[in-house]
C-alpha cells in the first residue's frame, strides 16, 4: 500500500534531502542561526536529518549587539539543547566606530554590522557552504534566488549568474574562496512554517506570542523599548500595548503588531486573515529602492 505524504511531510523530506546533500558535498558547512522562527524550523530539520547524532556542523550567529534580550537568552538555550557548537561573531570594528541604527541609519548599520560581520565570520572560519532560513515567499529578490545560491570569492550574489536546479539535482562545484548559500526552506510559506511549528511543537522565542509590552510609535511602526539605549524623540511616549512580532531582527528596526494571539492556533488564524507581508515590519527592507536585492549582491543573507 502506497502512503501519500502530506504537504508538510513533502516539504520536510525536501529540506532534509537538501541538508544531507550539503554535508555530503562540502568540506566545511555552517548553519546561520538568526534565532527567528525560520531558524527554529531549519535547526529542527537539521537535528532530524542526523538523529540520533547531532548535526555535523556548527551554528553561526552574527551578533549586531542590538538583538532583543529574549532572543539572546533563547539562543543559548537552543545551542545547549541541540548539542551543537555555537559560534558568535561581532564586527568589532563597527562596535569601535559606534555604528548603531540610531546614529548611522538602517542601511549603513545593516551593511557594517550584518553583511560585513557575516563575511568576516565566513572568511575567518573558511566555510564553503552556509545554510540560511530565507523563503521565496518572503520578498521578491528571494523569490528568484536558487536553493543553492552561488557566491563569488567576495561573497557577492549575481542574480543573472545562477545555476539550473532540475529534478532536485544541485551543482555544488566551487573554486577555492567561492562558497554556496543554501536555503532548505525556499519552498515553504509563512503558513507552512507556523503549521509545522505547531505540529512538531518546536520552541520559538516568546516575542512571537502576544503580551503587554512597552512600545513607542515611530514612523508608523511600533518599536519595543527593549533597553535604555532607545532614546525617545520629541513628542514620543512609551505605551503599554498587547503586541507580538511576525518577524524578528534588531529591536530598533523591527516593528511589532497589535495582537491578542498568544497561542499557536491563534497566531495561525491571525496570519490567515492578515493582508500584509510578515516583513512589513522590517525597516531594512524599505530603506532604499530594491533594498534587499542590493544587500544580497553585497553579501547579505
From Swiss-Prot:
Protein origin, superkingdom: Bacteria
EC assignment: 2.7.7.4
Coiled-coil stretches: none
Keyword Nucleotide-binding (UniProt): yes
Gene3D superfamilies recorded: HUPs
Nucleotidyltransferase is among the record's keywords: yes
GO MF entries: ATP binding; sulfate adenylyltransferase (ATP) activity
Catalytic activity: sulfate + ATP + H(+) = adenosine 5'-phosphosulfate + diphosphate
Cystine pairings recorded for this chain: none
InterPro entries on file: PAPS_reduct_dom, Rossmann-like_a/b/a_fold, SO4_adenylTrfase_ssu, Sulfate_adenylyltrnsfr_sub2
Pfam families xref list: PAPS_reduct
Annotated TM spans: none
Pathway(s) per entry: Sulfur metabolism; hydrogen sulfide biosynthesis; sulfite from sulfate: step 1/3
Any single GO BP term: sulfate assimilation
Functional summary from the UniProt entry: With CysN forms the ATP sulfurylase (ATPS) that catalyzes the adenylation of sulfate producing adenosine 5'-phosphosulfate (APS) and diphosphate, the first enzymatic step in sulfur assimilation pathway. APS synthesis involves the formation of a high-energy phosphoric-sulfuric acid anhydride bond driven by GTP hydrolysis by CysN coupled to ATP hydrolysis by CysD.
Name listed for the protein in its UniProt record: Sulfate adenylyltransferase subunit 2
Organism (species): Citrifermentans bemidjiense (strain ATCC BAA-1014 / DSM 16622 / JCM 12645 / Bem) (Geobacter bemidjiensis)
Amino acid at each position: 500500500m502506497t502512503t501519500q505524504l502530506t504537504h508538510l511531510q513533502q516539504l520536510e523530506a525536501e529540506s532534509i534531502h537538501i541538508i544531507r546533500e550539503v554535508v555530503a558535498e562540502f568540506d566545511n558547512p555552517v548553519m546561520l542561526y538568526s534565532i527567528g522562527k525560520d531558524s527554529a524550523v531549519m535547526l529542527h530539520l537539521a537535528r532530524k536529518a542526523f538523529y540520533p547524532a547531532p548535526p555535523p556542523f556548527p551554528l553561526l550567529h552574527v551578533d549586531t549587539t542590538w538583538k532583543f534580550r529574549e532572543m539572546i537568552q533563547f539562543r543559548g538555550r537552543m545551542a545547549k539543547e541541540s548539542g551543537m557548537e555555537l559560534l558568535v561573531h561581532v564586527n568589532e570594528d563597527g562596535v569601535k566606530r559606534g555604528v548603531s541604527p540610531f546614529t548611522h541609519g538602517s542601511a549603513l548599520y545593516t551593511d557594517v554590522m550584518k553583511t560585513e560581520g557575516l563575511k568576516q565570520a565566513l572568511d575567518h572560519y573558511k566555510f564553503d557552504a552556509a545554510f540560511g532560513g530565507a523563503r521565496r515567499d518572503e520578498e521578491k529578490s528571494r523569490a528568484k534566488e536558487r536553493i543553492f545560491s552561488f557566491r563569488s570569492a567576495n561573497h557577492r550574489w549575481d542574480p543573472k549568474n545562477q545555476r539550473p536546479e532540475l529534478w532536485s539535482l544541485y551543482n555544488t562545484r566551487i573554486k577555492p574562496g567561492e562558497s554556496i548559500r543554501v536555503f532548505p526552506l525556499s519552498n515553504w510559506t509563512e503558513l507552512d512554517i507556523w503549521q509545522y511549528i505547531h505540529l512538531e511543537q518546536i520552541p520559538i522565542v516568546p516575542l512571537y506570542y502576544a503580551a503587554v509590552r512597552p512600545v513607542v510609535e515611530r514612523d508608523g511602526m511600533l518599536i519595543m523599548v527593549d533597553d535604555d539605549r532607545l532614546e525617545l524623540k520629541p513628542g514620543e511616549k512609551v505605551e503599554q500595548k498587547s503586541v507580538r512580532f511576525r518577524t524578528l531582527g534588531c529591536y530598533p528596526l523591527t516593528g511589532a503588531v497589535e495582537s491578542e494571539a498568544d497561542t499557536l492556533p491563534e497566531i495561525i488564524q491571525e496570519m490567515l486573515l492578515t493582508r500584509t507581508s510578515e516583513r512589513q515590519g522590517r525597516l531594512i527592507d524599505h530603506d532604499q529602492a530594491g533594498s534587499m536585492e542590493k544587500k544580497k549582491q553585497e553579501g547579505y543573507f
